[in-house]
Amino acid sequence: MPVLRHMLILLCTCMLALPMHAQENVDFKGTSCVLVRTTTEEELAFRAGERMEFILHYKWGSINADVGTAKVALDSLTFNGHEAFRCTASGRTTKLFDLFFKVREEFASWFTREGMRPLKFTRDTHEGGYEARNTYLYRWDEPEPYIAADVYTSKLGQTSMQLPLTP
């Protein structure tokens, strides 16, 4: 059910949206694949402790039903010595729709409270017979920063790689 995955990704992205005036603070010099904004926690459009729950509804032809639920949460914590946020998003089909196509999705993203620099991202996906487990750990403190990526899919198996990351 790719609609559920896309909705969860959209929800996480929306939770991380910054106020428009924060774009003035973006430094594009030396930009790499990861855009890090220089903004303070007070300027953010969200706060730790926020929770959202959704009922996922599907309408197609004669099908008009609630097919699943999604949850998004934002917490504050310390991650490897950094004051950080953890945004979690999960989704699942209802027991009735599990009979047709069972979906279980879990996403988590850790990022610094000041500057919103990514620290870690995880994904645990089960959609019908397809599975994916991904972990991306941002190694900012290395002499040549990189993302340590561990990626598993039921179709391609396990892959580990280092993706270059320029701070």
What are these regions (language model features)?
Residues 24-32, 39, 47-49, 131-167:
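Solvent-exposed helix/loop surface patches that form functional interfaces
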Residues 6-17:
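Bacterial N-terminal signal peptides
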Residues 1-4:
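N-terminal secretory signal peptides that target proteins for export/translocation
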Residues 82-84, 115-118, 131, 144:
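Coil-to-beta-strand transition motifs
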Residues 22-106, 124-131:
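N-terminal cleavable signal peptides for secretion/export
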Residues 8, 77-83, 140-143:
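Short, ordered beta-strand-loop transition motifs
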Residues 103-117:
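A short, surface-exposed beta-strand/turn
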Residues 75-77, 110-114, 139-141:
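Short beta-strand micro-motifs enriched in acidic
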